[in-house]
């Protein structure tokens, strides 16, 4: 069964690669005129989905770029476990590392230029060997990884040693690939040291802590007092030890961080969201509550697949994993992998910067509070919590499909970060490959984060009665036919989960795709050696 139909996403397929949301909002946006569009053949039968997400075949030989991306993803997951998932920060750290790798590689390409030193690192033709590329990439990855993840410096050193390199070789002698890699990384690091993200905690306005806010943001509302219902307010989580914690707005200053390809964070700022009391917002809130009460096993799986878990690499990491699928599918060379990962990593960083500028500008709340306000004192059908399925509750008790320790991401809703990042990354993948076709299948376990200890009958219970019409197996296969559809699914997962209203997602997808369309000629210019 086709994933889109099984999700009942209200999507109308108007061509092999272009999808429209119900209502007619064109999310594909305009295509750069110099890029030929080849939608390819969208897979129709489940048997045709032989590309399994995150499962390389026995004969697969990863390129050096693919291997270092694996190290980057693992380091990012370790950081998320240490600090909770921080999608803005993760997107930047990945872009820093992938840009360093690209710049080191470019020194050994015939035409490509780096982002910081242009063509000044170009090595003579006799030095442009595969081995030199791999060594330069390794040192660039190592230096930049230690910069962005200093708490894991020893672990990262061991990864470099395991690949046969000396982490104490800090040479910047350009006649050696070690020197090229170190020099390329040092230039990117210096450029990003004070880029508005406040990584070191020493930028004006911060409190001295890494990545601390530099803008003095304070929420209009508190968990105990609503001053303005449209505005964001912290949500109390379980701390896992019997108490509660109400995290503040994660990196509210992120719109001030320096983007890669965008001129300004507000360059494509979306229009204002629907306001409190409007028919549009009322409709969006009712939709969230209705969907929450009727989640299928497949829909729950989609929520968790796109959310990832405690070891999350964020949407940047997730889309880089999709890019790895493409690498395996298309039998990429090292050169292709370096360029693809560089483009995906940077467009997602820019997407988060633009998204956070919108979040800070509009400062909107989340369904967690809005549903409770609108349906307070009313009995509604809703998800009752792990293993309870659908039950009737007072509207003031409504909650998303999520564990108690992470009910909703701690930042405003408009626009959705998942949707914005997915819109950008999916479009770059389409432009890079020349086709919207993806053709992957993700094999997941339903409820593995939220309801791991319950049977499918308990998960799908209704009013206290276990379901008798669901399969015993929790295995769900999610079919991802196109990059566009995968982005739509990522956005829809936030509505199904109860973290966002539809408007957050629709405008996020549009924003992300505008960013990608604007950025693509810049990436191509770096590849072609014509970047200024």
Predicted regions located by residue number:
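Short, flexible helical or helix-coil boundary motifs
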Residues: 11-14, 18, 152, 381
């Amino acid at each position: 069964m086709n994933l889109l139909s099984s999700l009942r996403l209200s999507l109308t397929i108007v061509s092999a690669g272009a999808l429209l949301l119900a209502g007619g909002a064109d999310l594909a946006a305009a295509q750069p005129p110099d890029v030929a569009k080849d939608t390819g053949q969208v897979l129709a039968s489940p048997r045709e989905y032989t590309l399994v997400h995150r499962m390389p075949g026995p004969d697969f030989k990863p390129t050096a770029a693919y291997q270092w991306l694996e190290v980057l993803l693992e380091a990012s997951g370790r950081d998320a476990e240490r600090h909770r998932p921080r999608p803005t920060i993760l997107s930047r750290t990945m872009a820093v590392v992938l840009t360093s790798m690209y710049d080191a590689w470019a020194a050994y390409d015939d035409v490509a230029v780096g982002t910081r030193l242009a063509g000044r690192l170009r090595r003579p033709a006799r030095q442009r060997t595969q081995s030199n590329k791999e060594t330069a990439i390794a040192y660039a990855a190592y230096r930049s990884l230690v910069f962005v993840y200093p708490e894991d410096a020893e672990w990262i050193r061991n990864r470099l040693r395991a690949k046969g390199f000396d982490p104490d070789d800090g040479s910047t002698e350009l006649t050696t690939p070690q020197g090229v890699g170190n020099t390329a990384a040092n230039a990117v690091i210096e450029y990003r040291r004070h880029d508005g993200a406040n990584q070191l905690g020493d930028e004006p306005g911060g409190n001295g802590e890494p990545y601390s806010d530099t803008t003095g943001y304070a929420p209009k509302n508190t968990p105990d007092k609503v001053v303005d219902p449209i505005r964001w307010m912290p949500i109390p989580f379980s701390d896992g030890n019997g108490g509660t914690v109400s995290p503040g707005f994660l990196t509210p200053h992120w719109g001030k961080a320096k983007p890669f390809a965008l001129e300004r964070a507000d360059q494509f700022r979306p229009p204002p969201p629907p306001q409190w009391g409007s028919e549009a917002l009322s409709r969006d809130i009712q939709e969230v509550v209705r969907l929450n009460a009727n989640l299928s096993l497949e829909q729950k799986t989609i929520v968790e697949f796109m959310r990832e878990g405690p070891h999350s690499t964020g949407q940047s990491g997730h889309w880089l994993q999709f890019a790895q699928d493409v690498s395996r599918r298309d039998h990429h060379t090292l050169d292709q992998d370096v360029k693809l990962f560089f483009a995906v990593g940077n467009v997602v960083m820019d997407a988060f910067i633009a998204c956070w500028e919108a979040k800070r500008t509009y400062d909107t709340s989340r369904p967690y509070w809005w549903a409770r306000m609108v349906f307070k004192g009313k009995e509604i059908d809703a998800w009752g919590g792990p293993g309870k399925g659908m039950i009737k509750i007072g509207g003031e008790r409504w909650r998303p499909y999520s564990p108690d320790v992470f009910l909703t991401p701690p930042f405003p809703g408009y626009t959705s970060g998942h949707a914005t990042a997915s819109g950008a990354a999916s479009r770059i993948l389409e432009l890079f490959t020349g086709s919207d076709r993806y053709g992957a299948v993700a094999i997941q376990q339903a409820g593995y984060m939220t309801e791991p200890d319950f049977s499918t009958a308990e998960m799908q219970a209704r009013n206290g009665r276990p379901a008798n019409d669901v399969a015993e197996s929790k295995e769900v296969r999610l079919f991802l036919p196109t990059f566009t559809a995968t982005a739509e699914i990522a956005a829809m997962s936030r509505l199904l989960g109860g973290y966002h209203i539809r408007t957050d997602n629709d405008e996020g997808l549009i924003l992300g795709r505008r960013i990608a369309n604007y950025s693509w000629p810049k990436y191509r210019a770096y590849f072609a050696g014509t970047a200024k």
